[in-house]
Amino acid sequence: MSVAQDFIAELDYELPATRTLLERVPSEKGPWKPHPKSSALGHLAQLVTRLPGVMGDIVRGIDLDLAAAPPYTFESTETLLRDFDARAKVARDVLRTAKDDDFALTWSLRHAGQVLDTGRRKDVLGNTINHLVHHRGQLSVYLRLNDIPLPKLYGPTADEQ
């Protein structure tokens, strides 16, 4: 099995699970925060939505410059899902054409051109999948705090038993 096939297998589980959680994000709760220092629910949901696109860029070797990233502007759950589906498709399509050698090349995270971090694409992609799962977990807590039933992610939830 190739490196790309391993990642595709992981995304084939994680991306549909993520989408089921995003489906539960209520459009009217976008500005809600559990604490003044926390991100808004809409911001967090949009971050989760954008990460599959970052995954595709990592594999293609397109560095991320945080200063050039578009601002977070939560619109609606429908927009979130449309954006997520498009980005998930790109990630899968890029992985389908990737060669093992692509994953040994480097990728960098920048801010205004200054390199913040550099790593092998294989390592960075794995970390980005972990980052997605981490923020998906945060999002599930935000939803729970708003009494929104949670879907099954790794096993049944109290809402689905």
Identify the meaning behind each predicted range:
Residues 1-3, 47, 108:
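Short low-complexity stretches enriched in small and charged residues
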Residues 8-22, 27-70, 110-161:
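Short, contiguous alpha-helical
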Residues 97-114:
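Acidic catalytic patch
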Residues 3, 10-14, 83-87:
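Soluble or luminal CAZymes and related metallo-dependent hydrolases
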Residues 57-99:
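Helix-adjacent hinge/juxtasegments
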Residues 3-8, 76-81, 125-129:
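Active-site rim elements
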Residues 2, 39, 72-75, 98, ...:
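Short coil/turn linker and secondary-structure boundary residues
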